[in-house]
């Protein structure tokens, strides 16, 4: 009977079987009253059940029980073989780490979402049962695996709410389609800009801005202590030994959430070799140490709401201290700032965007349960701050680069439109943390500054521009993108052109801030596009 309707039913059953583990895995405690024996999957009036014991036999000895053989017909043979490995592959996480995350505000939101799909047999949300199963499974000698999460689920059965699951998949498909349409529109507009620039003829573009400069510089680490905020943080300072022309222009680099000063060390060296003084602070409430503290049980959340205030204030204090300590060496009235992710927000706040409590009220009270924008889990933490004007902008900032910024809600249209300094926004088409469409492409259309640039890295992810540290776990291509060195070379060239133009005041570099120059840099593995304006017709085509 089921074989006759194999088309759509087969596709959806296949999705459920292959993604059962993926629905559980991202939300990585309490002794169960009973252990789950079956997984129930409903499809309209039809209900299927799968004994967990059959999965255990298949995972441990490779034998396909009759109750599992039925489902094997709905999955490609190679995928069915992969299922065995997926079930028993341990996930490297400690019980404390998984518990800390699941009890954090962000973890609880993720549990709520997943609990809509993975429920108890009585059709109750799986929030508490999933949390219990994950933590209990992490205590097992073999470590946390999909199989032992299923075995530790503390009710007789696990029910997959297929209707809700398919709704999420449909929403995701729509977002992907909208994003692809917008990206295609951006790339087309960039190609048209490049063609027009080539027709008009460009200035000499003989310089290879990816290459290091010839300026010698020193590196030192200074620790700043802000007594008023009880906050101490280190800063790596790269100083040119002999600035070629008067005071050295200054660039500040702000790292992302869970990162640290070395993330953009490659860019600091590059800019310093071209005569810039570069300051790279480490933000103590949202750096790698903060994440480690969370996973060790020493912190309660990924980043406290106060980080939305403290990060810009770190940089304002840094500039104050440099002004008093390096008078006569640095031009601190013409400063550029570059930031990635949470650092992208930081750079936009310093450039003129204040926390937008009206937008936070709309988007976060409560958080839209259907949103697929993961960055809102962080942005909405700012809603817990007392609503007031924190005066985060700094008049010394004369240009900003925001890479994969998160700002659509915490700053929103009304605040992003207030920024009047030159601005470059960098997006990755495959960014699943701060998705390109809602976080960069759409916000770019809200900008009113006359000097604005949208840079798009096709196949770029949230992590493509980051340099790994020695302690980093190697990440797969799906996370990093095809070749991070390509993205890093792009950032060297474009950030140098931007800061030479708007911070060092060298107008001859403005020609490099063009679609044509980006086209000349572009590589097949990660195509590069740059544009300065999205025409109304292009916006309409992209659904913006």
Question: PLM features: residue spans?
Answer:
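Short beta-strand element of the alpha/beta-hydrolase
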Residues: 246-256
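Gly/Ala-rich beta-loop-alpha elbow adjacent to hydrolase catalytic centers
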Residues: 256, 339-347
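N-terminal cap/lid segment of alpha/beta-hydrolase-fold proteins
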Residues: 192-246
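Conserved alpha/beta-hydrolase "acid-adjacent" motif
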Residues: 432-439
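Short beta-strand/loop motif that positions the catalytic acidic residue
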Residues: 419, 425-427
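Mature extracellular/secreted ectodomains of secretory-pathway proteins
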Residues: 48-51, 59-202
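Cap/lid segment of the alpha/beta-hydrolase catalytic domain
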Residues: 258, 262-265, 270, 282-309, ...
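Alpha/beta-hydrolase active-site loop
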Residues: 300-332, 349, 359-378, 386
């Amino acid at each position: 009977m089921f074989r006759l309707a194999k088309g759509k039913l087969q596709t959806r059953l296949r999705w459920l079987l292959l993604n059962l583990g993926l629905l559980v895995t991202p939300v990585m405690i309490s002794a169960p009253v009973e252990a789950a024996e079956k997984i129930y999957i409903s499809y309209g009036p039809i209900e299927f059940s799968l004994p967990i014991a059959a999965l255990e036999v298949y995972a441990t000895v490779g034998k396909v029980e009759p109750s599992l053989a039925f489902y094997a017909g709905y999955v490609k043979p190679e995928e069915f073989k992969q299922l065995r490995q997926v079930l028993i592959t341990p996930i490297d996480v400690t019980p404390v780490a998984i518990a800390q995350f699941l009890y954090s505000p962000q973890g609880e939101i993720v549990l709520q979402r997943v609990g809509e799909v993975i429920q108890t047999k009585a059709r109750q949300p799986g929030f508490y049962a999933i949390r219990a199963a994950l933590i209990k499974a992490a205590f097992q000698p073999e470590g946390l695996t999909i199989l032992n999460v299923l075995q530790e689920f503390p009710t007789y059965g696990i029910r997959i709410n297929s209707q809700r699951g398919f709704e999420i998949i449909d929403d995701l498909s729509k977002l992907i389609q909208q994003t692809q349409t917008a990206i295609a529109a951006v790339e087309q507009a960039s190609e048209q800009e490049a063609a027009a620039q080539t027709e008009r003829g460009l200035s000499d573009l003989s310089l290879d801005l990816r290459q290091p400069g010839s300026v010698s510089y020193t590196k030192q680490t200074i620790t700043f202590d802000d007594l008023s905020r009880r906050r101490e943080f280190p800063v790596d300072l790269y100083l040119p030994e002999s600035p070629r022309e008067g005071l050295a222009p200054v660039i500040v680099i702000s790292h992302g959430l869970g990162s640290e000063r070395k993330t953009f060390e490659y860019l600091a060296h590059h800019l310093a070799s071209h005569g810039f003084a570069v300051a790279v602070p480490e933000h103590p409430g949202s750096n790698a140490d903060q994440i480690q503290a969370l996973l060790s049980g020493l912190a309660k959340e990924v980043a406290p709401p106060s980080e939305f205030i403290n990060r810009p204030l770190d940089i304002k204090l840094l500039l104050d201290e440099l002004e008093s300590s390096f008078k006569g060496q640095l031009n601190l009235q013409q400063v550029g700032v570059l930031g990635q992710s949470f650092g992208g927000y930081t750079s936009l706040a310093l450039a003129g965007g204040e926390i937008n409590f009206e937008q936070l009220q709309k988007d976060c009270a409560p958080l839209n349960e259907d949103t697929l924008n993961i960055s809102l889990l962080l942005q909405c933490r700012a809603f817990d701050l007392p609503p007031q004007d924190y005066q985060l902008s700094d008049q010394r900032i004369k240009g900003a680069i925001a890479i994969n910024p998160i700002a659509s809600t915490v700053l929103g249209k009304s605040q992003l439109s207030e920024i009047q300094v030159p601005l470059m926004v960098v997006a990755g088409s495959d960014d699943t943390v701060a998705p390109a469409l809602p976080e960069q492409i759409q916000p770019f259309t809200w900008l009113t500054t006359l000097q604005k640039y949208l840079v798009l890295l096709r196949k770029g992810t949230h992590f493509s521009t980051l340099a790994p540290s020695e302690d980093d776990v190697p990440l797969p291509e799906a996370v990093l993108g095809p070749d991070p060195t390509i993205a890093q070379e792009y950032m060297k060239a474009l950030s140098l052109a931007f800061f030479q133009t708007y911070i060092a005041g060298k107008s001859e570099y403005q020609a490099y801030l063009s679609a044509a120059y980006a086209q000349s840099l572009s590589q097949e593995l990660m195509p590069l596009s740059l544009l300065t304006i999205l025409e109304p017709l292009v916006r309409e085509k992209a659904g913006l």
